[in-house]
Amino acid sequence: MSDSVILALGIAAFTVIVLVLVAIILFAKSKLVDSGDITIGINDDPEKAITLPAGSKLLGALASKGIFVSSACGGGGSCGQCIVKVKNGGGEILPTELSHINKREAKEGYRLACQVNVKGNMEVELPEEIFGVKKWECTVISNDNKATFIKELKLAIPEGEEVPFRAGGYIQIEAEPHVVNYKDFDIPEEYHEDWDKYDLWRYVSKVDEHIIRAYSMASYPEEKGIIMLNVRIATPPPRQPDAPPGQMSSYIWSLKAGDKVTISGPFGEFFAKETDAEMVFIGGGAGMAPMRSHIFDQLKRLHSKRKMSFWYGARSKREIFYQEDFDQLQAENPNFVWHVALSDALPEDNWTGYTGFIHNVLYENYLKNHEAPEDCEYYMCGPPVMNAAVIKMLKDLGVEDENILLDDFGG
């Protein structure tokens, strides 16, 4: 047999082997890899069903069809907000979901939409209010410091549009990949002391992917055409100076008037109860946002006559904001009072008001002698340590869970 024949047979054999392997791979792919279009039935309503290619996560699949499920962490599985009920399909619940979903909920079909792989036809159940959620490209009106580490971001909604939110609600804000240099931040001189002390100007935030985060609104429904946020910059803690700074807060702090920003919403469950009970608002830091929204809504839109008070904790006098607004509301509404407590007042503050942590101030100066603290409704938003201290104090007073309403987004 000539060398040329042997070579030809070798090539032919090799080709056959390659073709067989390709066939095996294609067969395996057809069985194991998602392909083709699938249908997701929603709320047993044929008109709400969506059809799309298999292979994505449920959160992204719904978003691609204009159905936006809340996800403060942007689909990372850490916030636990994107809970939906999967009635059919979706596979087994994953370990990453079990920190947010208990055994009873898992048995009933509740899942994190960001963790569910869409491999075949599915049936899901979504809250009806989700179908009112939309996206808007907004324009930055202003982005000004209200405290050392808090900016007020004011956004203009596109002309002719409106975000039909309720006081206490929140929106999600999006950002594309970007690089932010802290040295480029526009921060008034009066707030430079801590920035210089900790050399915060040295930080750089580099983000390589699309991100989404949730922020409570400081605006209230009657402030038409705008969305207002209070955003605290998430700098690395002093004991971990090499940790990366907060991605979204860094991005928001870099925004300037005229910049475009994509938001979606409205979302929320931190809403005021429709009762005649006394309302006690407790806030700290950027937790001011939903407090402002609620109090303005109660007094300026609803003209509520319910007895209400607002207790706000700040470090020093320069960390107090919206003071003139709340002073005016107090002067105009005999049913409303507000108090500030400074935890670290400066000598130059010449502060004669309350001092200490806000939960202690609230207890010592009001609730300790209140005839029925368990009958009040408590609305709070602030740093986790504040929230925990307030909740413990209220529990010790006999306040039931149903009268303790917490917004986790402030801090």
From Swiss-Prot:
Details of cofactor binding: Binds 1 [2Fe-2S] cluster.
Main localization (coarse): membrane
Stored InterPro entries: 2Fe-2S_ferredoxin-like_sf (IPR036010), 2Fe-2S_ferredoxin-type (IPR001041), Beta-grasp_dom_sf (IPR012675), Cbr1-like_FAD-bd_dom (IPR008333), FAD-bd_FR_type (IPR017927), Flavoprot_Pyr_Nucl_cyt_Rdtase (IPR001709), FNR_nucleotide-bd (IPR039261), NqrF (IPR010205)
Short name of any one Pfam family annotated for the protein: Fer2
Gene Ontology CC annotations of this record: plasma membrane
Domain FAD-binding FR-type, residue spans: 133-273
Cofactor(s) listed in the protein's UniProt record: [2Fe-2S] cluster; FAD
Compartment(s) where it occurs, according to its Swiss-Prot or TrEMBL record: Cell inner membrane
Enzyme class of the recorded protein, top EC level: translocase
Domain of life: Bacteria
EC number(s) recorded for this UniProt protein: 7.2.1.1
Positions bound to [2Fe-2S] cluster: 73, 79, 82, 114
Start and end residues of each 2Fe-2S ferredoxin-type domain: 36-130
Biological process terms in GO annotation: sodium ion transport
GO MF term list: 2 iron, 2 sulfur cluster binding; electron transfer activity; metal ion binding; oxidoreductase activity, acting on NAD(P)H, quinone or similar compound as acceptor
Membrane topology of this protein: Single-pass membrane protein
TM stretches of this protein: 5-25
Role noted for this protein: NQR complex catalyzes the reduction of ubiquinone-1 to ubiquinol by two successive reactions, coupled with the transport of Na(+) ions from the cytoplasm to the periplasm. The first step is catalyzed by NqrF, which accepts electrons from NADH and reduces ubiquinone-1 to ubisemiquinone by a one-electron transfer pathway.
PANTHER family recorded: NA(+)-TRANSLOCATING NADH-QUINONE REDUCTASE SUBUNIT, NAD(P)H-FLAVIN REDUCTASE
Similarity annotation: Belongs to the NqrF family.
Subunit annotation: Composed of six subunits; NqrA, NqrB, NqrC, NqrD, NqrE and NqrF.
Protein's name in the database: Na(+)-translocating NADH-quinone reductase subunit F
Lineage per the UniProt record: Bacteria, Pseudomonadati, Pseudomonadota, Gammaproteobacteria, Pasteurellales
